[in-house]
A protein has these predicted regions:
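Hydrophobic transmembrane architecture of multi-pass small-molecule transporters
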Residues: 139, 161-253
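Hydrophobic alpha-helical segments of secondary membrane carriers
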Residues: 33, 157-161
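Transmembrane core module of solute transporters
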Residues: 1-153, 259-260
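Perimembrane helix-loop junctions in membrane proteins
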Residues: 12-13, 58, 181-185, 251, ...
Length: 260
């Protein structure tokens, strides 16, 4: 089916999806860079509030207060980026953006279940800088050199790839988060249940406070879950940071025309 689709679209005079756009280096490299970067960005935007609400004790409102700050610097800096886009190589803007995203994700990879609100907030604010230098320059690179009559088709294909990558990125990230958390949970349980004095003392202390044995075990399991899902989130943050860095050479494959 897919082979038939390719053959049809490549030979049709008026194709629904103009695959010949991918003959242009700027378009295919820019579209792929945009799709992967957006998938990483959106996956982490979804993962953060899930972790905060489920394992850090944040309410939906409080986690929303953390994530909403990402727009502050983006709103301020986006007009500056747009104004200077014709003067500066957009690849430099995108490179700076990916470095900022990598820094933000590295900062998040230092989180623990004891991390306070302000420490969690700082990377989110900084992420706004990356957003300002991300979307506008990448669109400029992707559409650079496209003939005016093909601009609508090129924009549509690029946006479709970006939105699809966002959906895939979210699904992959949340699935990996849960799978890796299960792995960490198993290994943490082995440590907790290995007959250590600390575990026995903790159970005794909780039972002295009036908790039954099942309640004490359930509470310890909850603590193990918190650590397991936090470790899993940290792994995803690290991996995402490395992927943003890996995308930087990919951006420099393109040869955008100055000013778009």
């Amino acid at each position: 089916g897919f082979a038939f689709f390719l053959a049809w679209e490549l030979t049709e005079d008026h194709p629904v999806v103009d695959l010949s756009l991918f003959k242009g280096r700027n378009f295919w490299a820019g579209s792929i860079a945009t799709a992967i970067a957006y998938g990483l960005f959106f996956a982490n935007v979804v993962l953060m509030p899930l972790w905060l609400q489920q394992y850090m004790g944040y309410t939906a409102t409080r986690s929303g207060m953390v994530m909403a700050q990402v727009g502050l610097l983006a709103i301020v800096l986006s007009p500056v980026v747009g104004k200077n886009l014709a003067k500066v190589d957009p690849r430099k803007f995108v490179t700076f953006s990916f470095l900022v995203f990598a820094l933000v994700l590295w900062m998040r990879a230092q989180f623990s279940t004891q991390t306070d609100f302000d420490t969690i907030l700082i990377p989110t604010v900084i992420q706004g800088i990356g957003m300002a230098f991300f979307f506008i320059p990448l669109v400029s690179i992707t559409l650079s050199g496209i003939e005016p009559h093909r601009m609508a088709a090129a924009s549509g294909v690029s946006n479709f790839m970006r939105i699809t990558a966002g959906a895939f990125g979210t699904s992959i990230a949340t699935t990996l988060w849960e799978d890796r958390a299960k792995w960490h949970h198993v290994h943490l349980v082995e440590v907790v249940s290995s007959g250590r004095t600390v575990t026995a003392d903790a159970l005794t202390g909780m039972q002295n406070l009036g908790l039954t044995s099942p309640q004490s075990l359930a509470l310890i399991n909850r603590w193990v879950d918190e650590q397991a899902f936090t470790l899993s989130a940290i792994e995803i943050f690290y991996a995402s940071a490395l992927m943003f860095l890996a995308l930087i050479p990919f951006v420099w494959i393109t040869r955008p025309r100055r000013g778009g």
